[in-house]
Amino acid sequence: MLGLLGATTLMLVAGAPWVLPAGGADLRSPENVVVSIIDDNFILKWKSSSESVSNVTFSADYQITGMDNWIKLPGCQYVTSTECNFSSIKLKSVYEKTKLRIRAETGNSTSPWYEVEPFIPFQEAQIGPPDVHLEAEDKAIIINLSPPGTKNSVMWAMDSSSFVYSLVIWKNSSSLEERTKTVYARDKIHQLSPETTYCLKVKAGLRSPRKVGVYSPVYCINTTVKHHLPSPENLEINAENRVYVLKWNYTYENVTFQAQWLHAFLKKIPEDHSDKWKQIPNCENVKTTHCVFPQNVFTKGIFFIRVQASNGNSTSLWSEEKRFNTEMQTILFPPVINMKPINDASLRVGIGAPKESEDKSVNQLYPLIYEVIFRENTSDTERDVLEKRTDFTFSNLKPLTVYCVKARALIENDRWNRSSVFSDTVCEKTKPGSTSQAWLIAGILSAILLFPAVFYGVKVVSRCINYVFFPSSKPPSTIDEYFAEQPLKNLLLSTSEEQTEICFIVENTNTITTIEETDQIDDNHSRCSSQTNRDSGVYSNEDENSGSKIGEEILRQAAV
């Protein structure tokens, strides 16, 4: 094995030799000192500088950090060859810094010590090939791998379940058709042909710290004849509402199926886990090529699922195992959007959990971010933003304008891209901004100040219109002062309603009595006398009583 791994040997640069008095002048220190660590095998190699001296042996010491004294290196004392195996060294930890030194010896003479640069065994160790055991099926090969190192390995004691195995497989008849894949310590290679010879090799590696091992020797095996009852193929599992639906393909009829599941982490443990498979509820002895089971069968994590067909006493081989990640199957429902206007022409958006998420919010199970599409209602220009918050505000918007928003949930994980559909679009109108409010206040104040002036102007215009088109029936005061003080209401009376005054004529040659009656009829004066009153003697008079009294007084005077 060491010959196989010679290419991976580590070269440790030697330091300056630690010079001690030598017994012979021709005995020199070893050269080209090399330390090779593969798994738990520690090999020290060197080149002799005293080939001309016979009976030369070599001895080495080691020292660990914290030790004051040098200790003889086991397996490397009085060695006649140019290498030694010190795998039996009792190291407290493979993570401690270690020092080595070596010298040549012959008789009582010794060369100066040649001290090797200090090193940490784990950092310098190389990963050896795993042990490989193969079993054949008709269309598959079962692989059983043992991790590198010994059973009680000190070097890989903390990493035995962390190894990642890389396999290269090809048909023996054609090495050009190589296929490389990552496998577990207990795994199965599918999609092979029956009765065919396949060859493969495997190497192990660590991801942290990153270490890559060497390939194992090549192993070859023949697949068996085709099984009379084929295995189910093309397994597929999907989440629908609160259940999982497992489907597969099968060409034969009148068969029943059963499905089992296994925790994926068990695959990393290098041991037989065939008894760890468990039956899936509602997926036993089913006659259809699908089965439905509740989601609570699986907790959050990664699992493997396999299906087997049965026909009476005959059973098929297990199908190819389907890797199933519950996180990948989780259904993301669209979020619930709430938007309301706030001051200064801004809109506040709130994102809530959907009703379909039952009693647990989706973001309690997975870290979510939200893709938010925001736009003005009358515009096709959209603003696309990503938000981790469930409450945020869009500011500096146009006052009294309708804006619309919709959003979808995304799983915040670089390993996959999962998202929900977009939510329903929600639209809301912004409030007036501070500028609009200032203009509104200014407008109100201006209206209050201009109202008296407008009112006065309207009043003046109204008076002018009334004066021109609707003049007053009463004469102006300058004209009215020439009329009698008696009212003119009688002028408006009809003829039948006019008051009359009866005049009496008394003939007296010596005395002429003139009765003068003044009436205000159409602003003219009427007179009545004894000389001219030979007509009917009927006159209109406003005050009949006063006229009668005056007439009676005149008659009495005449009689006297």
From Swiss-Prot:
Q: Which residues does UniProt assign to the signal peptide?
A: 1-24
Phosphotyrosine PTM positions read Y467, Y482
Which residues are connected by disulfide bridges in this protein? C76-C84, C199-C220, C283-C291, C404-C427
Which residues does the annotated region (Important for interaction with TYK2) include?
492-501
Q: Note the topology in the membrane.
A: Single-pass type I membrane protein
What PTM annotation applies here? Answer: Ubiquitinated, leading to its internalization and degradation. Polyubiquitinated via 'Lys-48'-linked and 'Lys-63'-linked ubiquitin chains, leading to receptor internalization and lysosomal degradation. The 'Lys-63'-linked ubiquitin chains are cleaved off by the BRISC complex. Phosphorylated on tyrosine residues in response to interferon-binding: phosphorylation by TYK2 tyrosine kinase creates docking sites for STAT proteins. Phosphorylated on serine residues in response to interferon binding; this promotes interaction with FBXW11 and ubiquitination.
Q: Where is the lipid attached (S-palmitoyl cysteine)?
A: C464
Segments crossing the lipid bilayer: 438-458
Q: Which residues lie on this side of the membrane: Cytoplasmic?
A: 459-560
Q: Which residues are glycosylated?
A: N55, N85, N108, N172, N222, N249, N254, N313, N377, N417
- According to the record, the residues making up region (Disordered) are 520-560
The residues exposed to the Extracellular compartment are 25-437
Q: Which residues carry this modification: Phosphoserine?
A: S496, S536
- Which GO cellular component term is one of those annotated? plasma membrane
Q: How does it assemble?
A: Heterodimer with IFNAR2; forming the receptor for type I interferon. Interacts with TYK2. Interacts with STAT1 and STAT2; the interaction requires its phosphorylation at Tyr-482. Interacts (serine-phosphorylated form) with FBXW11, the substrate recognition component of a SCF (SKP1-CUL1-F-box protein) E3 ubiquitin-protein ligase complex. Interacts with SHMT2; this promotes interaction with ABRAXAS2 and the BRISC complex. Interacts with TRIM10; this interaction prevents association between IFNAR1 and TYK2.
Protein's recorded name: Interferon alpha/beta receptor 1
Its source organism is Sus scrofa
